[in-house]
Curated annotation (Swiss-Prot):
PROSITE patterns: AA_TRANSFER_CLASS_5. GO terms for molecular function: O-phospho-L-serine:2-oxoglutarate aminotransferase activity; pyridoxal phosphate binding. GO terms for cellular component: cytoplasm. Transmembrane segments: none annotated. InterPro entries: Aminotrans_V_dom, Aminotrans_V_PyrdxlP_BS, Pser_aminoTfrase, PyrdxlP-dep_Trfase, PyrdxlP-dep_Trfase_major, PyrdxlP-dep_Trfase_small. This is Phosphoserine aminotransferase. Its EC number is 2.6.1.52. It comes from Blochmanniella pennsylvanica (strain BPEN).
Length: 362
């Protein structure tokens, strides 16, 4: 059978080993004779799964004890509201939103419902290539309570590889597409959040890493389900959690450990993206519009110089066993998402197809 590879930005490809385990355990999990999707979330077996998942997450990311790990329902968009509601004392407090692309901008727009965020655009263009200013040049307010940014924009394919170091501010990061793709200095951040359907498993779950001193009763009115203190006090079980998503995340964490941890995963991710970028740059048929220093290694947009071939490229790529390559409607073109589960073989197959297609229609 022709092996199929899924390059979708999310929900994204899962490791084959994890998919097989889910299939094997779906009808009878943990030798219980019942499925993990029907077991009580307060059973001792599921509570053990939860504790192991949190510990594995701490081990992988080297999360220190002054941080809490929360497993929340829903996607990252919910956190666009939850963050200002949980952190602000009044709606007049100054906050900074660094705009690196589509998702950072959407977070800022949502924050406007609760405060007057200062929007700081750090994206520029030189010689037709988009770039991001170095952090040292970001025009951050002296008196802002927190700074929010997105280190990797999945739609734009642009990334910030520096880690902010603002000791006098709460640094909040939407790491939905990069968390677990490599090591991260957690202690530079106040809050990190990431939706699961990219590198953590399946949709329905968002993980939050929050400094414990920020777990205070909010001053603004916050729905209980978005109240970080309530979630922490109830061990992320204030409501019935998305048990299937928690279960798959727990398998992903075990899989990451078996692969050698995040340094090894990052090495593989760098290798995969380097191969694809090289194929794009050397083709004279495809192109990428991001500067070298800000190219994402998770989400790689590329364009055909003859855009009239776009539909044909997508049609033939599916026949070749390559799915999810259509670019986002905001950007257009193509996009290959190379999350942790994407194999080197999958990237090489994409490159083979791109070469064959270019030779056929050049």
């Amino acid at each position: 059978m022709n092996e199929v590879f899924n390059f979708s930005a999310g929900p994204a490809m899962l490791p084959k080993q994890v998919l097989r385990q889910v299939k094997e355990e779906l009808y009878s999990w943990n030798n219980m004779g019942v499925s993990v999707i029907e077991i009580s979330h307060r059973s001792k077996e599921f509570l053990q799964l939860m504790q192991e998942a949190k510990q594995d997450m701490r081990d992988l990311l080297d999360i220190t004890e002054n941080y809490e790990v929360l497993f929340c329902h829903g996607g990252a968009r919910a956190q666009f509201s939850a963050i200002p509601m949980n952190l602000l004392k009044t709606s007049s407090e100054r906050v900074d939103y660094i705009i690196t692309g589509y998702w950072a901008y959407n977070a800022a727009i949502e924050a406007k419902k609760y405060c007057d965020p200062r929007i700081i655009n750090v994206v520029g263009e030189k010689n037709g290539l988009h770039n991001i200013q170095p952090i040292s040049k970001w025009d951050v307010s002296e008196n802002s309570l927190y700074i929010h940014y997105c280190p990797n924009e999945t739609i734009d394919g642009i990334a910030v590889y520096e880690t902010p170091n603002f000791s006098d501010k709460i640094v909040v990061a939407d790491c939905s597409s990069t968390l677990f793709s490599g090591p991260l200095n957690i202690n530079r951040f106040g809050i990190i959040y990431a939706t699961a359907q990219k590198n953590i498993g399946i949709s329905g779950l968002t993980v939050i890493i929050i400094r414990k001193d920020l777990l205070k009763e909010p001053c603004l009115v916050v729905p209980s389900i978005l109240n970080y203190k309530i979630l922490a006090d109830n061990f992320s079980m204030f409501n019935t959690p998305v048990t299937m998503s928690w279960y798959v995340a727990s398998l992903i964490f075990k899989w990451l450990k078996k692969q050698g941890g995040l340094k090894e995963i990052n090495k593989r991710n760098q290798e995969k993206s380097a191969l694809l970028y090289d194929a794009i740059d050397s083709s004279n048929f495809y192109y990428n519009n991001i500067s070298l220093s800000n190219r994402s290694y998770m989400n790689i947009p590329f364009f055909l110089k003859n855009s009239k071939l776009n539909d044909l490229f997508l049609k033939e790529s599916i026949s070749f066993g390559l799915h999810g390559l259509k670019g986002h409607k905001v950007v257009g073109g193509m996009r290959a998402s190379l999350y942790n589960a994407m194999t080197l073989e999958g990237v090489k197959k994409l490159i083979r197809f791109m070469k064959l297609f270019s030779e056929k229609y050049r």
